[in-house]
Amino acid sequence: MRALLTFFVAGLLVLSSPAMALFGNNQNSSFASGSNDFVPVDQAFPFNYFQQDHRITLDWQVKEGYYLYQQRLSFSAENVVLGDIQMENGQPYRDEFFGDVNIYTNPLFVNIPMQDWQPGAKLIVQYQGCAKAGFCYPPETRVIDITSFTNGDMAPATMPTQTANPLDTSTPQPLTQQDQLASGLADNWWTPLLFLALGVGLAFTPCVLPMYPILTSIVLGSGKLSQRRALGLSLVYVQGMALTYTLLGLVVASAGLQFQAAMQHPYVLIGLSILFVTLALSMFGVYTLQLPSSVQTWLNNLSNKQQGGSSAGVFAMGAISGLVCSPCTTAPLSGALLYVAQSGDLLTGGVALYALAMGMGIPLILVAVFGNKLLPKAGGWMDRVKTLFGFVLLAAPIFLLERILPEMWSTALWSALGIAAFGWLYHVKNSLEFGGWKQSAVGIIAVLGLFASAQPALNYWFTDSSQQTQTSEVSFIKIRNVEELQQQLALAKQAKKPVMLDFYADWCVACKEFEKYTFHDPAVAAQLKQFVLLQADVTRNQAQDIELLQAQQVLGLPTIDFWDAQGNPVSNARLTGFMQAAPFLEHIQRISN
């Protein structure tokens, strides 16, 4: 069904959703036994450093089959000032749960210049990695004492090894795991072309297209101009608009980390979803979205002071117009800014938004040079295009909420959107300007789309109700520390029930795979009813989390421990790494029996 919706949402969603990537999907890997085949973190990522006067070099020798997250690298200091950090960019990697991130599978060297040393100077380094087989280590912190030095040149040091083009950052700004698009596209030369194409598409939205003839007359002013003069003025106007967009991109990119951190919070995802739904309602004619009258008056007065036909006045008008977003451009522009924020790259942010503005300005240039004859005639088709963009905007919140909603609900939302969109298409087919085979083709597409959209919901409704109940009844008792674990083990012993303890963290890919593919399998869910199910969420890696991990001798996640009905740990039953539903079911059956 999503394939049928792709042409509705491709342009917007390429920008506004961090699109499922990097870390690697390990759902096909499994461990038939509970043995721990993973090495300690210091063997997986041997860490060394050496200081040479006012420079320090950090060195990770990444073991084969393991990788470090770029977005989990962070550097801070006490009693010393860090200069420009130079490090190579990681390799793009895709994961269905966390989106696009970068990883390091080869030795990594980071050079950090320093200045203004004071007694007690320290460098705090944080990092985290995983095994490709589906096993993640908790975040690691190393505190390095900085010896005294004399201030020197703060220019970035030369990399000891050259395996890729270095990525310069004024402050340590690793990319987040969110990610939708930033890591995957930032290094590709065609990124500006993508934004240019998006800008052209935005120019032909119903909120923007009718304004071009009016805008052209304002830009060119009174009097007849040569094509060369008209071309020059329209280019100047577009450059003014592009300047505003470019500055906006630079500002957002410079605050990339703040945007990245905020975008991971469920409240932010819900807020953005409400915003997109609100914008969609305006496209359906529920209300009229426009700037407050006071702002409109101020912008109009400011624009009227500029003289059409003069380069300076036209440039100023273009810069002012870049501050105004119509209902048709607000959501795509928000998506573009989201992409820029995720990249955290000033060059990427500036070039991408400049290309977007240039794309939006191409129709204006054509109209200024060749006249209105190049524009399609206004008519009822524009209202239908406006409604179509309403469905596009409704698709955006579903992509955002998929990250926090159960799969059942996200599937239901996709089905509902598809049924509504293709139902509307079938409803309006008879009012199209053309008839004959073209109208019939639209009707066939609408009917096929309706069936395809309804299929996921029908599959759920006709699934055996007992299986649905089994899936929904899998729930865990949350524990936070060693004391709570001991209390729950004592209660389970009194009830003469075996215990399963699942160590979980939001940054653990395989933990989410366990939750989606294994625990919610109907047969597994039924068997787990015989257990007391405990779960320790160690996402925040606080002191009590570390104490619990050490008490259970947990190297990394996922890790699942078992106790029998007498309260004794089951030897050789520990699971580390992802396991598919079928072998996991056999494993817990052996324990429960």
Curated annotation (Swiss-Prot):
Keywords: Cell inner membrane, Cell membrane, Cytochrome c-type biogenesis, Disulfide bond, Electron transport, Membrane, NAD, Oxidoreductase, Redox-active center, Signal, Transmembrane, Transmembrane helix, Transport. Residues 451-593 form the Thioredoxin domain. The chain crosses the membrane at residues 193-215, 235-257, 269-291, 318-340, 347-369, 384-401, 408-425, 440-462. It is an enzyme of class 1 (oxidoreductase). One of its GO terms (biological process) is cytochrome complex assembly. Pfam families: DsbD_N, DsbD_TM, Thioredoxin_7. This is Thiol:disulfide interchange protein DsbD. Required to facilitate the formation of correct disulfide bonds in some periplasmic proteins and for the assembly of the periplasmic c-type cytochromes. Acts by transferring electrons from cytoplasmic thioredoxin to the periplasm. This transfer involves a cascade of disulfide bond formation and reduction steps. One of its GO terms (molecular function) is protein-disulfide reductase [NAD(P)H] activity. It catalyses: [protein]-dithiol + NAD(+) = [protein]-disulfide + NADH + H(+); [protein]-dithiol + NADP(+) = [protein]-disulfide + NADPH + H(+). It is a multi-pass membrane protein. Its EC number is 1.8.1.8. InterPro entries: Cyt_c_assmbl_TM_dom, DsbD_gamma, DsbDN, DsbDN_sf, Thiol_diS_interchange_DbsD, Thioredoxin-like_sf, Thioredoxin_CS, Thioredoxin_domain. The keyword Transcription does not apply. It comes from Vibrio vulnificus (strain CMCP6). Disulfide bonds join C130-C136, C207-C328, C508-C511.
